[in-house]
Amino acid sequence: MSESVKTIEEQFAAWQTEDAKFSKGNNAAGARARKALSEMAKAIKARRNEITAEKNARKEAK
């Protein structure tokens, strides 16, 4: 499993935790939830690039 996939999973878990806290009225958890979403977005972009590179490498290998 790539590092970006691990990061996505970790940040998703963090987001779920913080979002639940925010829903219960903890406003500070909202900032942490947004940060987790931002980190997840970065990791998702990195994974998209990894997938594209692997796809192109497979194309060239044929």
Q: Locations of the language-model features?
A:
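N-terminal acidic leader/helix
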Residues: M1-K21
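Short amphipathic alpha-helical/adjacent loop interface patches that line ligand
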Residues: F12, L37, I44
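Secondary-structure edge/capping motif, primarily at the C-terminal ends of alpha-helices
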Residues: W15-S23, A29, I51-E54, R58
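Short, charged, amphipathic alpha-helical segments
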Residues: G30-K35
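Long amphipathic alpha-helical coiled-coil segments
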Residues: A36, R58-K62
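Amphipathic alpha-helical coiled-coil segments
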Residues: M40-E50
